[in-house]
């Protein structure tokens, strides 16, 4: 099983219960929809899946490994298994499209190499090819802040594809 979410619970400090008993599993090749009204906890669940939030109960297993109790190195490896595209796209607005795609592949928000051009020609060519695949070949050097919402979404998609995750979550 690629991903198992077992009875996940999340309560925020203000006593808001965001998730009460989220449970589902995802196998390789599955398409799964998490649906619900605004405020139902979907984004909270996705933030738990990528490790930016901790759950208060239940378990998340990725390829059979318990995510919450894994050491930092293992958690980082697990996080690369799940690529997430959020509603706000989580892009660096002043950086170019290419820099944002390259940055998506870096651990722990280490953005400096993308900004300073420390990537090899092969990696840059891969980023440019991904931008071409999402219809943004002419925007490679364009700062993200100059793009439309749909174009920003495509940069975010290219960045997640660059990570080569086993699972992609679209918020």
Q: Predicted regions: what is each one?
A:
Residues 168-171:
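Catalytic Walker B motif of ABC-type/P-loop ATPase nucleotide-binding domains
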Residues 50:
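Helix-to-loop junction immediately C-terminal to a conserved catalytic motif
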Residues 59-77, 118-120:
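ABC ATPase NBD Q-loop/coupling interface
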Residues 143-147, 151:
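Conserved ABC ATPase signature
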Residues 66, 113-138:
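Conserved ABC ATPase "signature" region
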Residues 1-5, 10-21, 71-72:
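A short, flexible loop at the N-terminus of ABC-type nucleotide-binding domains that lies
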Residues 35-37:
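The feature captures the beta-strand-to-loop junction immediately N-terminal to the Walker
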């Amino acid at each position: 099983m690629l991903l198992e979410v077992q009875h996940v619970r999340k309560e925020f400090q203000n006593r808001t219960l965001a998730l009460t008993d989220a449970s589902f599993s995802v196998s390789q090749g599955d398409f799964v929809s998490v649906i619900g009204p605004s405020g139902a906890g979907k984004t909270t669940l996705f933030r738990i899946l990528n490790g930016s939030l901790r759950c208060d109960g239940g378990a998340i297993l990725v390829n059979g490994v318990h995510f919450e109790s894994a050491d930092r190195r293992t958690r980082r490896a697990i996080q690369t298994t799940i690529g997430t595209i959020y509603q706000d796209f989580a892009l660096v607005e002043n950086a170019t499209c290419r820099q944002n795609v390259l940055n998506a592949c870096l651990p722990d928000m280490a953005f400096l190499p993308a900004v300073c051009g420390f990537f090899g020609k092969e990696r840059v060519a891969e980023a440019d090819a991904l931008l071409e695949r999402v219809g943004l070949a002419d925007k490679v050097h364009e700062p993200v802040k100059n793009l439309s919402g749909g174009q920003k979404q495509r940069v975010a998609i290219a960045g997640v594809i660059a990570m080569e995750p086993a699972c992609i979550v679209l918020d």
